[in-house]
Each structure stands twice: as structure tokens, then as C-alpha cells.
């Protein structure tokens, strides 16, 4: 009648990626989204690893999976060292990517049961760090630009 053979219902995507955001350094990473859903929210203000464990973010294995794994944040400081995970995977000749804010996906499982993984979106803050001359325009205004008319630009 039936076979005792197991049927594969879906596949997970396991990604190793190094994504660049912008010129660094940045102040913080605030959010990681997969598609239209938040996978992580917080305030990552130093280089380090974020662990996300939301395998049911899109409905689990029976639907479109989720996100589960490690994301290594590199904010782009002048003293940023080469990434140890990239060196282990692709060889020791890795730059430090100083002056570049990036994230390394350390093989997380993303999505399942869908041939198109959800796009990743990142919410960053770059207000006080990364100025060309090292001087911020408004440290006293807590990152909120002045609304005085002299600061408005007209065309």
C-alpha cells in the first residue's frame, strides 16, 4: 500500500553572507527584519554576535519557515579587526573592513518551503559617529536636528 520512505516537506536555506550597509562607523543596529516581520529588535552598539531563534517567524516548516542562527555585526570602526568566521570559511587573507559597516550571516537558517527566501532589511542609526572631521553637528540635541527656519532648505 504505502511506502515507509520519508518525504521531504521543505528545505531550509543556510546562508553564509557578508553584507555591506554604508560608510562606517555607525552608532547602532536597531532592527533586523525578514520580509515584513521583525526578527530582532534592540540596540547593538558594539561589534558582536546577535543570536536569533525565530524558526516559526513565517509559519514554521509547514509554511515558509523563519530565521534561526547567528548574525555578526561589524560597525566599521577604525580599529575593526578581520572577521574570524570569514577567515575560517574563506582563508586568512581577510581585511578588517575598517570604515565599512557590515554584517556577516554565520550560516543561519532562513526560510523554508519557499523557493524565494524573504529579503532581509536592517534598521541602522548613524548620527554621532562617522563624521568626516569627527565633529557631530548636534550632540546637544540628542540626534534630533533643529527645526529652526535657518536650517531649512528651500528650492
Predicted regions and their residues:
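Polar, S/T/G-rich
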Residues: 1-155
Amino acid at each position: 500500500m504505502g511506502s515507509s520512505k520519508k518525504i521531504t516537506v521543505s528545505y531550509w536555506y543556510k546562508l553564509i553572507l557578508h553584507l555591506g550597509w554604508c560608510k562606517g562607523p555607525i552608532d547602532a543596529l536597531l532592527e533586523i527584519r525578514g520580509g515584513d516581520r521583525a526578527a530582532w529588535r534592540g540596540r547593538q552598539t558594539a561589534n558582536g554576535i546577535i543570536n536569533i531563534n525565530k524558526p516559526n517567524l513565517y509559519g514554521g516548516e509547514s509554511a515558509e519557515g523563519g530565521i534561526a542562527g547567528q548574525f555578526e555585526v561589524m560597525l566599521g570602526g577604525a580599529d575593526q579587526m578581520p572577521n574570524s568566521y570569514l577567515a575560517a570559511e574563506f582563508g586568512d587573507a581577510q581585511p578588517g573592513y575598517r570604515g565599512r559597516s557590515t554584517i556577516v550571516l554565520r550560516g543561519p537558517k532562513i526560510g523554508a518551503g519557499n523557493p524565494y527566501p524573504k529579503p532581509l532589511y536592517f534598521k541602522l542609526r548613524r548620527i554621532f559617529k562617522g563624521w568626516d572631521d569627527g565633529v557631530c553637528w548636534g550632540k546637544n540635541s540628542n540626534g534630533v536636528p533643529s527645526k529652526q527656519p535657518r536650517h531649512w532648505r528651500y528650492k
